[in-house]
Amino acid sequence: MAAASNGSEYFEFDVETGRESFARPSNAETVEQDEEDLRWAAIGRLPSQRQGTHNAILRRSQTQTQTSGYADGNVVQTIDVKKLDRADREMLVRQALATSDQDNFKLLSAIKERLDRVGMEVPKIEVRFENLNIEADVQAGTRALPTLVNVSRDFFERCLSSLRIIKPRKHKLNILKDISGIIKPGRMTLLLGPPGSGKSTLLLALAGKLDKSLKKTGNITYNGENLNKFHVKRTSAYISQTDNHIAELTVRETLDFAARCQGASEGFAGYMKDLTRLEKERGIRPSSEIDAFMKAASVKGEKHSVSTDYVLKVLGLDVCSDTMVGNDMMRGVSGGQRKRVTTGEMTVGPRKTLFMDEISTGLDSSTTFQIVKCIRNFVHLMDATVLMALLQPAPETFDLFDDLILLSEGYMVYQGPREDVIAFFESLGFRLPPRKGVADFLQEVTSKKDQAQYWADPSKPYQFIPVSDIAAAFRNSKYGHAADSKLAAPFDKKSADPSALCRTKFAISGWENLKVCFVRELLLIKRHKFLYTFRTCQVGFVGLVTATVFLKTRLHPTSEQFGNEYLSCLFFGLVHMMFNGFSELPLMISRLPVFYKQRDNSFHPAWSWSIASWLLRVPYSVLEAVVWSGVVYFTVGLAPSAGRFFRYMLLLFSVHQMALGLFRMMASLARDMVIANTFGSAAILIVFLLGGFVIPKADIKPWWVWGFWVSPLSYGQRAIAVNEFTATRWMTPSAISDTTIGLNLLKLRSFPTNDYWYWIGIAVLIGYAILFNNVVTLALAYLNPLRKARAVVLDDPNEETALVADANQVISEKKGMILPFKPLTMTFHNVNYYVDMPKEMRSQGVPETRLQLLSNVSGVFSPGVLTALVGSSGAGKTTLMDVLAGRKTGGYTEGDIRISGHPKEQQTFARISGYVEQNDIHSPQVTVEESLWFSASLRLPKEITKEQKKEFVEQVMRLVELDTLRYALVGLPGTTGLSTEQRKRLTIAVELVANPSIIFMDEPTSGLDARAAAIVMRTVRNTVDTGRTVVCTIHQPSIDIFEAFDELLLMKRGGQVIYGGKLGTHSQVLVDYFQGINGVPPISSGYNPATWMLEVTTPALEEKYNMEFADLYKKSDQFREVEANIKQLSVPPEGSEPISFTSRYSQNQLSQFLLCLWKQNLVYWRSPEYNLVRLVFTTIAAFILGTVFWDIGSKRTSSQDLITVMGALYSACLFLGVSNASSVQPIVSIERTVFYREKAAGMYAPIPYAAAQGLVEIPYILTQTILYGVITYFTIGFERTFSKFVLYLVFMFLTFTYFTFYGMMAVGLTPNQHLAAVISSAFYSLWNLLSGFLVQKPLIPVWWIWFYYICPVAWTLQGVILSQLGDVESMINEPLFHGTVKEFIEYYFGYKPNMIGVSAAVLVGFCALFFSAFALSVKYLNFQRR
């Protein structure tokens, strides 16, 4: 026996010994039994205390002996389940599942059988809801649009209504209306209903996660107990529709974290001891594979869990377990895989009550079937309680459920066994047509537009039956009575297992929680390595600049003037450390959505995350302080003593910690990028102004002195000054006073002179860091995310008329789509597409440099023919569409693509084609009608009149049934505005209004319920019938959707085609082709051909029958027919010309600019969180500056007064400017994703778009300038002459403009907002240092003076100071200077009197430069990776 490195032990049995010990006849069953005996013999040899944590597994060798069935040299190995490596965990799961398919039936059956043999029962939960009503208060009509005026009105109305002065004017919206029901353990319940029926609200209410603003009445119980009696958030899980994950973690890391936090081991750990004890007592020997799995799954506190491997396998995520999850801007797993990660994250734990909200979005029907089947096995065998809402369940998926709840318009229309639902509707007079899925029928039968087609009672004429009547009929039917009688019987609490409901808030201890969060944060810091390295290099770089500006050869401790320069250097170090923390803000806010989701599911307490991230910032602060001190301290020549050097370093560390705490606090309180940026700037403004450097304490107004004592920077400033100026080298007697230079300087600037102020400074700064981080923890614990989803009730005058759809309208719609267009054929032959081999795969030893995603794909798309592109997830459907449409931004494409026989030209192709993307990307602040009008105006030819365009937009809106939503705001996905399916229809409509000849649609029906999918497909079919060429990728086609297609291109993983050609009536051509292949099981009657086709072409089946579907297709008649077709259509018809246009875009540049400006104007007017907040902040900042520097402009008797005025202007420029630059970045960033879609669609050129984006800012900047200018000009007390006031406003306007354009430029030049924030902050530091305030122009060394001239803040200061004080002849009489104010300005600041015009011209130049850089970045840079 030898001990292995991972805590495993080997027992080598040679085969002969094995045969003697267990002599039996040789067949497969006895071999298995022999192996089992060997395993138990190995376990039996272990000491008894180790038998609970060890298990025996059989390591199978490659060769299997024919005679005995034993492996040559097979090794039975005992492993310690607490020390499993990844290979062991994967092997355990594989052996326990006992199948290569994605199925858990054998494993769960074996576990159930094991428990049944000793008479143990698993805890069960029954969920009941009785008389549940849920109401929301909503704004109606145009008041629901968030314009600047409406938001201001809402704010004042809220204030007045909270003071009981007025009554709130809102409309009540009933989301759920008096519904009752039971969800039983051990039975799978499906929740169906059209969009807006209240499915998500019901799921959230049952999971105890209902938004506090909704009014709930009625009762919800688990096992007869109310929700406040136990921890409902740990007992049940709500699996959300939106996929919120940390993009930089891999799938496995995401699930491992979830498993540890939820205590994945609790599931089995609770009864493993009792189970093994009972088995020993009764002499029962379980299967060793199941025993090994259960033991491993019940191990607590391990970093990696066997539950993760199990969930990865069951959800089919094992293929992408080491891929980053990714997000919209970062490449990661596919949309369908991300949706499964969301499911896996909640199911990896021990929760057995699951409320699953549309978990199949983006999955093909066979994957959905597999997953639902695995969940059904879990429900039936482990007595779990599951309520699952699905949008378009295929018939075979629908049949997996036991019970059904049908909601519509908030009413409960049916609840009971699934098989009785058709009988109930037949009793009302409706009938299910043949070849129609039950789920599709149920979603449409309650709808006003679709109900009539299902009427089947010849005895009476059809009359619309409203939902309320159907709900009443259900309550009075035998099915309703049956449901009521179940509810009437009270739950038997005695039979309930007390351990079924969780009584503690978290699954693991506080220490464990902290460890888990710490490990994850450390991993994320490694993933954000570039950001942190960049920030450290930036500190080094700015430090180097500072060191060379204040070089010690130029500075000597011989006079107060040099002392002032040293003080500027010290102050700048502090301010830089402070600003360096600002980039923590976007990082923190981007992490909040995931944090809130995990907090609300009781993964971990808020403090464990906030402390872990705080602790990991400590080494980072140490590094920053060491780098800065190392570069700056001795180069500048600060007090040469080791003690003072280390004290300097400690002080910088404390300031950095305080700053990180401050910005994290801002982020956790604001919870929104724009608001946080704005109020973050306001906080720094106060801290900075009252820090004791810009204004000495003696000059601070009495009403602001408290601010000086509260400002953390003032303590840092005093400590750093005391540390330097009490050193021995500053003890030379002063020439202008009777003390030493050092003490005189401290007194002049109102600093204390005692050494203990250094230690007070350190203590206060660290105290602030602790305080701020505690506030972060409290904010994370008690505040909820902003921007909750709100239903918006819109007043639509046409609502009633729109619902009456008559035959004439349908006919006119079909005609209405015919604006003139040219039918086109697209052929493509042997298309290949490669990308560079991903690093992860190269690191695993893959030798190739390129990865092939498409392999010799050929086909034809013809006019009037609807083609489906089908394949499992990852088959390359979207890739093929992107390549054909010319949407790929990277990779290598080969092959021949032709349009009506002519080679494809991308620029003209964008004009004649439309591309409906899978992600519905739209500007959030415009309405549905405005989105369509914008697209139509830009993309329809100039020749079409405005009236024709309007009529066309109307017809398209009716066609996709968006006419009742014309005034609805688009909003952000998953939070505000349109629902998923409404957004999808809008995406299609935006392309249809362009009147294209060829339309590509990527997943037009994913994320839609059956009725919405039918509406979309009806739209698509109508479009094709007008003679257009339409191609759709499709995931989950129901029979009717699939059979709406004419032709099919079927792909498999690796981007290979396995079928191309006609579908035939009832898909007969396709079925005949596959049934003609030897080994393919035939299709059963009434089964969905799309589902069957995906099931019979899986890799598992290819392996089983040893065949390659791609090769078989290449040898088939179908393939030869397609090739012949391509050959014939690749030659242009005689006399035909390739498509060409006189210009690249359908509108000229001026029209593009005006339309972009029109849209941007709407976006800005409806962005109160940006524009209203900016104006409010400007007003607050102006009042702060005005009251801090009250009347300082009229004092001109001393140099200190003039320096203070300069300080006021410098602070205002820097802070308001930086605030403008920071808060514009998220707006530009959101609009950029929309721009990428619109640019790819050929809507407009980049320059008109950029011009509109820049120009729309001007009126808001002007308003901001007037607000700021009027307040500060008169409070600071400058001369009240009109010309000086106008000049002041002009300089401020130009300053705010160049800062805003600089912020836009920073986003334009970088791939994401985080990097834009970090890079722009580097320049703020340099502008701060060399703007002429900290180091005046005459004192800037010759090697840096060039930077002074390219620093825009320097020109602002020069312009403003000269415009206000450049002509003042008042005298200054001081020991160091004697002359007029005008002369002092030239002597001290280096400003020449005739430079006002030049300064203004230079600032206009900076505005133009930054704007041009933004425009060029928009034109030439593309950070979208496709």
Swiss-Prot record:
Q: Which GO terms describe its molecular function?
A: ABC-type transporter activity; ATP binding; ATP hydrolysis activity; ATPase-coupled transmembrane transporter activity; efflux transmembrane transporter activity
Originating gene: ABCG31
Induction of expression? Induced by cycloheximide (CHX).
Xref: InterPro entries: AAA+_ATPase, ABC2_TM, ABC_trans_N, ABC_transporter-like_ATP-bd, ABCG_dom, ABCG_PDR_1, ABCG_PDR_2, P-loop_NTPase
Q: Which Gene3D superfamilies match?
A: P-loop containing nucleotide triphosphate hydrolases
Q: Does the keyword Repeat apply?
A: yes
Give any Gene Ontology cellular component: pollen coat
Q: In which tissues is it expressed?
A: Expressed in seedlings, stems, leaves, siliques and inflorescence. In seeds, confined to the endosperm. Highly expressed in the tapetum of anthers.
Q: CDD domains in the record, alphabetically?
A: ABCG_PDR_domain1 (cd03233), ABCG_PDR_domain2 (cd03232)
Similarity-based family: Belongs to the ABC transporter superfamily. ABCG family. PDR (TC 3.A.1.205) subfamily.
Q: Which residues make up the binding site for ATP 1? A: G193, P194, P195, G196, S197, G198, K199, S200
Q: What is this protein called?
A: ABC transporter G family member 31
The source organism is Arabidopsis thaliana (Mouse-ear cress)
Entry-listed glycosylation sites: N6, N150, N219, N856
ABC transporter domain: which residues?
Answer: 160-434, 826-1078
Residue ranges of domain ABC transmembrane type-2 in the record: 512-725, 1151-1365
Q: What membrane topology is annotated for this entry?
A: Multi-pass membrane protein
* Any Gene Ontology biological process: export from cell
Identify the Pfam families for this entry.
ABC2_membrane, ABC2_membrane_7, ABC_tran, ABC_trans_N, PDR_assoc
The residues that cross the membrane are 530-550, 569-589, 618-638, 649-669, 675-695, 760-780, 1172-1192, 1202-1222, 1258-1278, 1285-1305, 1315-1335, 1342-1362, 1396-1416
Where does this protein hold ATP 2? Answer: G871, S872, S873, G874, A875, G876, K877, T878
